[in-house]
Structures are given as C-alpha cells and as structure tokens.
Amino acid sequence: QQLYVCARLVSFLREVEKEDGIQPGKSVMIVPTAIGASMNEGSRLWEPENMDINRRFPGDPAGSTTERITDALLERVKNYRYGVQLTSFYQPGSFVPHVRMMDTGRQNPDLGCEFGLPYVYVRTPRDYDQTTLNYNWQLCGTQAYSLYAGKTREIDEAAADQSLRAIVRFLNSRGVIRSETAPGHASAIITNADMTSVSATSAGLLRRVKFAGA
C-alpha cells in the first residue's frame, strides 16, 4: 500500500512539474523504500538480522547493516522542513487513514490537520519509540508526520486515494506545490488519553461486525 501511494505521488508530481506547479525554491524528495530486498521477500523486516528498520534510528555509520542504512537515510532527509513517512504497522489490521506524530515537545499537530484526514494522533513515546524515524526526524528539526495509509500487505484503492489527496493537500497548504485540491476533513487532534483497547472477555470465534471507518 505504501509503495503504491508513493508511485502515484511520483506520477502526480511529474505532471505538476510539467505545468510549473512546483513553487520556486521548493523541492520534494521521495524515498519509496529503504530496503528493496525485504519488500521482494514480502517482509517488513531486514531478513539477515530479522530487524525492523524503524527501530534502528538514529543509526550508526559504523554499526550493523540496518544502523548504517538508517544513519544514511536520516542524513539525507534531516534538513527538510517537512517530512511525511508512509508507515506500515507491526500488527495486522486496517486503519482509517490518519496522521500520527510523537510527542517530543517539538511536534506541531495543528500543521498535521492540514492533511485533512479525520484525526491527528499525538502519541506519548515509550522507550522503544525513541528509535523510530518520526521521533528522530523531529529531533533533527523537521516537522515529521507519520501517515497511516489504511493497510500494509495489500492495496486498498479507496484508502490510497484518500492518502494521496492528503499529501497533495498538505504540500499545497505549505506552499510547496500549486495544484487544485478538494477540501478535507476538519481533523480532530487526539492523544493517548482518547485511546481505548477493547479485548474479548472469553475465548471463541471472532465475527467482525464493525470495520474501520464504517
């Protein structure tokens, strides 16, 4: 799903560029994937080390393979004013497309509302969150946002459309590109205090009666 949204964004921005829609002095860099080999194997982990690359930031130029990759990636992107990460999730499931960011003291959730998605989730980081791209990107001075695009292992066209429109809307709002965009949602800003875990009270078969966004 994330690679598909990136591919569509590249195609869209090529057309914008042909029409001189990239604003003077602005640029957009797109990194579809950091480790193509893992995608070829259908895994979100770096297989030789069985490591989640998003738990290896800020990286180490003299460290393991994943640490060298994350160090090089962060060096390339840390000087951008805004950053959008199309995030996969470590657990199976589906999401209403939304924006997340870590509470680092440097986050700006009001800017996150400019994506026009239903909600912006400001998450209180746990210790292991301090090794993620979003957390370390913010510490570098970038307004970094994680965009959850619906699914991970399969393409959801409706969620991909919504995610693409959200990114274009944000780029337009921030004066990076000039393009017509439809208005989005009036985003709600939520925190950990608004989240609830729902667990079954007994064992048995699960029949789903509610779906994300329905």
Locate the predicted segments by residue.
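Structured catalytic-domain cores with a bias toward divalent-metal coordination
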Residues: 1-214
